[in-house]
From Swiss-Prot:
It holds the Pfam family TruB_N. It comes from Bordetella pertussis (strain Tohama I / ATCC BAA-589 / NCTC 13251). One of its GO terms (molecular function) is tRNA pseudouridine(55) synthase activity. GO terms for biological process: mRNA pseudouridine synthesis; tRNA pseudouridine synthesis. It is an enzyme of class 5 (isomerase). This is tRNA pseudouridine synthase B. It catalyses: uridine(55) in tRNA = pseudouridine(55) in tRNA. It comes from the Bacteria.
Length: 244
């Protein structure tokens, strides 16, 4: 029996990825739901993270290169007092705050956050898809091997403190491509002297696209015609498609 290839759909689906799914798994579910023959996404979200996944169908996959280069915005929840090997709540605790730690002072946090705005250097986490000798770093990490990683320059456009409780803070971060928010959380915790990791992460913008227009998988699957959720090629912001 011939394998079904799907429809030759062209357009962009703004998907609100749920927690617990890999970006590729979410993409494949969306692709099947709209019955597209060709699909790709424009930047991975970790399984624990939620939010905007830009899914390109058919000819819209031509914007993928520009979207990978685009700035992104996140809402991140920082948990103070513990650092993990992965930089987020899924990892193992590797460092704790000094005995007697009772939370962070808001003034100290605001001061530290201001130091991370601009061009900074980050050491990529071991739990990442960056490769060494053809193998992703996360495979080395899972085997208990830590490798030296050269620092990389990234740009933090802004950091806004959205909420604060002493042991947790929620921040809004706009950043350049290649920025690891897990590493940012870890570095903020170290600068405060108490350690920190990500308790939650939600992506709200990728280039010109916003989470405000995104649809969940459940809502997509409940639509009578899921193809109606796609942004048509003539609805895409000017300049995204390469010149032909």
């Amino acid at each position: 029996m011939a394998k079904r290839r799907g429809l030759a759909l062209d357009g962009v689906l703004l998907l609100d990825k749920p927690v617990g799914l890999s970006s590729n798994h979410a993409l494949q579910r969306a692709k099947r739901t709209v019955d597209a023959a060709k699909a790709g996404h424009t930047g991975t979200l970790d399984p624990f993270a939620t939010g905007l996944l830009v899914c390109c169908m058919g000819r819209a996959t031509k914007i993928s290169g520009r979207m990978l280069e685009a700035d992104k915005t996140y809402q991140a929840t920082l948990q103070f007092g513990e650092e993990t090997d992965s930089g987020d709540l899924t990892g193992h605790i590797v460092a704790r705050a000094p005995d007697g730690f009772a939370g962070v002072e808001e003034a100290a946090l605001r001061d530290v956050l201001s130091r991370f705005v601009g061009t900074i250097e980050q050491i990529p986490p071991m739990y990442s898809a960056l490769k060494r000798d053809g193998k992703p770093l996360y495979e080395y990490a899972r085997a208990g091997i830590e490798l030296d990683r050269p620092p990389r320059q990234v740009t933090i456009r802004h950091i806004e403190l959205l909420s604060f409780s002493g042991m947790q803070a929620q921040i809004d971060v706009a950043c350049s491509k290649g920025t690891y928010i897990r590493t940012l959380a870890q570095d903020i915790g170290r600068a405060l002297g108490c350690h920190a990791h990500l308790a939650a992460l939600r992506r709200t913008h990728v280039g010109p696209f916003s989470l405000d227009r995104a649809v969940t998988l459940e809502a997509l699957q409940a639509m009578p015609d899921a193809k109606q959720a796609l942004l048509a090629m003539n609805e895409l912001p000017a300049g995204l498609l390469p010149a032909t």
